[in-house]
Amino acid sequence: MVSVLFVCLGNICRSPTAEGVFRHLVETEGLAGDIRTDSAGTGSWHIGQPPDGRAQGAARKRGIDIGDLRARQAKAYDFERFDYVLAMDSSNYRDLASMCPRDRRDRLHMFLDFAPEVGKRDVPDPYYEGGFDAVFDMVETASRGLLADIRHRHGL
């Protein structure tokens, strides 16, 4: 089974959105038994909380429910548990790289590297600035690219 962890700052906006979108795509493609998903934050402020209501609303508008997810903090042992650890932005990437064992660096990626057509490396944080629908669009595009990569690398 291939395992994927999406990571942002607080695990209440971008990473649960990415987990929900990717989980929905995986289920739609009939791969739920082959790919496991989770999300986490580099910070600890929101542990145990559900996704931001605006993120849930943006997902709901597209037929995806992320209300069951709960925030947790990323830990070094996640690099042992997940094949893909995906940072939403450069700051998240630096924080994750600082806890990543050297022999697991190949598991750490920028999420938008799977969507070069977006033309950005960072998924913007909509918590203060808004833009949940634009973030959702980026996440959908990157999720399709990620699934294509997983299919290619893992023969799914």
Predicted regions and their residues:
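Conserved active-site segments centered on acidic
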Residues: 1-81, 148-156
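Phosphate-binding/catalytic loops
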Residues: 84, 90-156
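Hydrophobic structural packing positions in well-ordered secondary structure
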Residues: 8, 59, 86-87, 139
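Helix N-cap/beta->alpha junction signal
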Residues: 15, 89-90
